[in-house]
Amino acid sequence: MNSIYEKLTTCLASVREKTDFVPETAIVLGSGLGDYAEQIKIETTIDYKDIKGFPTSTVPGHKGRFVFGYVDSVPVVIMQGRVHYYEGYPITDVVLPTRLMGMMGAKKLILTNAAGGLNTDFNPGDFMLISDHIATAIPSPLIGANIDELGERFPDMSEVYSRRMREIVKEKADKLGIKLREGVYVQLTGPQYETPAEVRMCKILGGDAVGMSTACEALAARHMGLEVCGISCITNLAAGLSDKKLNHKEVQETADRVAKQFTELITAVV
């Protein structure tokens, strides 16, 4: 058995020792957005540290647990905190939680993140619906022997982010009166914030927002056949686009400011 898949089955067995909950939708909460998990009807929670072989997040604002429950009548599993490539994990560990949620039964994945705005029309506090991504700065989670149990060797990526789900998000945002941007997300490695020169490069490539997560998870999810939706909370303007120095505290403060709108939007979309 492929060692990566073996690790996944070990993690799944560990989860199943604690709950037999089968989610329909999986949700990953980004920096500063983790409180959404407290708003649902919670059935049970599992700390990452209690799952054998599971990587744990070291980032402030990431609690590090799965929350199982219901948004209205929809069964969901929520990642309250994610692991990042910059924490030193191999990329296969970074996407292990995504794959695990798919193996739990999830058919849809909603990815959220805190991101820097590259598009000068964007403002801190805006939400950006991800239409596509650029992930060439990070290794693909599909490198290595293909895990046939998960998906095919050469998966199509012409529509990573579901057009159907994007239309739903737009419709719900419009009904809620939430201003929604749309654009291309660029994933860089971090943990350092981008230099002004890197920001210029990302803009030339066609990026509208930049961050340190999400794209690799979307790739792994699409490989498994999950329907993917991505939403960025623009928490700051990228380096060189304003006079402010970038810091994680600002990211969390901006996310806190728009938390109510975020909760309304995600609940409506689910």
Model-flagged regions — what are they?
Residues M1-M157:
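Metabolite-binding pocket within alpha/beta catalytic cores that recognizes anionic/polar moieties
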Residues S14, K18, R164, I168-I178, ...:
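Generic non-transmembrane alpha-helical segments
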Residues G102-G105, K203, R222:
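Non-catalytic positions within long, well-ordered alpha-helices that form the structural scaffold/packing
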Residues K107-K108, D208, E227:
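Short acidic/polar active-site loop segments enriched in Thr and Asp
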Residues K172-D208, I266:
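Active-site/ligand-binding-proximal alpha/beta "capping" segment
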Residues M212-E250:
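Zn-dependent metallopeptidase/amidohydrolase metal-coordination segment
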